[in-house]
Design a protein with these regions (language model features):
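Short S/T/G/P-rich N-terminal loop/turn motif that feeds into the first structured element of a domain
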Residues: 1-53, 60-70, 93-97
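C-terminal structural segments of small proteins and small subunits
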Residues: 65-90
Length: 97
């Protein structure tokens, strides 16, 4: 069984309020064993367009990645995030070991 990942590109519209999303999302990340591989950091756009922040979150498997996204805990956080940021958000399978 391969791991699964959230790949999220973020443009924050309200830097002052965005931390509300981060705080609200924490319980879902803990509950589902999320592991941050990339969280912000310096980057260079080599092709195409970019957003100001990039996040990669690893989950045990595809079912867990979707369960976290669909959980009441994360959906509450998502509502907050949508007020303060624009995102491109995908869930993708990793390469099998």
């Amino acid at each position: 069984m391969s791991k699964a990942y959230w790949i999220v590109r973020v443009s924050v519209r309200d830097e002052q309020r965005y931390p509300e999303y981060l705080a609200a999302a924490g319980p879902a990340f803990q509950k589902f064993g999320a592991r941050f591989i990339v969280r912000g950091g310096k980057f260079e756009t080599m092709e195409g367009s970019a957003r100001e922040r990039n996040v990669v979150v690893e989950f045990q498997d595809r079912a867990t990645a979707f369960a976290c996204y669909r959980s009441p805990e994360y959906q509450s956080a998502r509502t907050i995030r949508q007020k303060y940021a624009d995102t491109d958000f995908i869930i993708i399978d990793g390469v099998a070991d």
